[in-house]
Swiss-Prot record:
The lineage of its organism: Bacteria, Pseudomonadati, Pseudomonadota, Gammaproteobacteria, Chromatiales. Catalyzes the NADPH-dependent reduction of 7-cyano-7-deazaguanine (preQ0) to 7-aminomethyl-7-deazaguanine (preQ1). This is NADPH-dependent 7-cyano-7-deazaguanine reductase. Its EC number is 1.7.1.13. The gene is queF. Its main location: cytoplasm.
């Protein structure tokens, strides 16, 4: 597996697909670029999901998150793009992504996006 940023999300088979259980991940080092100023934006991402048949592989998730370092985008658009890519890769029963962006201009921004499967 590569150590370079990548838009590829790898998965593995859910070891207990007959059961609902929740996977929670905290990703404290998300960075992207402000589309207006080009300055870096920093966020902590909280991912919560109930898998169906596949779970996201952690190293590929890390490399995927790194791939946003030089990407410009509004907080709302990037949060929904990441959720959409994760849903496409894993097809979960439920998934929620919460992005807690650091203060910019005296304003903290939190964006929550959800997917309800089944």
């Amino acid at each position: 597996m590569s150590t370079e940023p990548s838009k590829t999300l790898e998965t593995f088979e859910n070891p207990n697909p007959e059961r609902d259980y929740t996977i929670r991940m905290e990703i404290p080092e998300f960075t992207c670029l402000c589309p207006k100023t080009g300055q870096p934006d920093f966020a902590t991402l909280n991912l919560e999901y109930i898998p169906e048949r596949h779970c996201v592989e952690l190293k590929s998730l890390k490399l995927y998150i790194w791939s946003y370092r030089d990407v410009g985008g509004f907080h709302e658009a990037l949060t929904n793009q990441i959720l959409g890519d994760l849903v496409a890769a894993t097809q979960p029963r439920y998934m929620k992504l919460t992005a807690h962006f650091n203060v910019r201009g005296g304003i903290w921004t939190t964006v929550e996006a959800e997917h309800h499967g089944r």
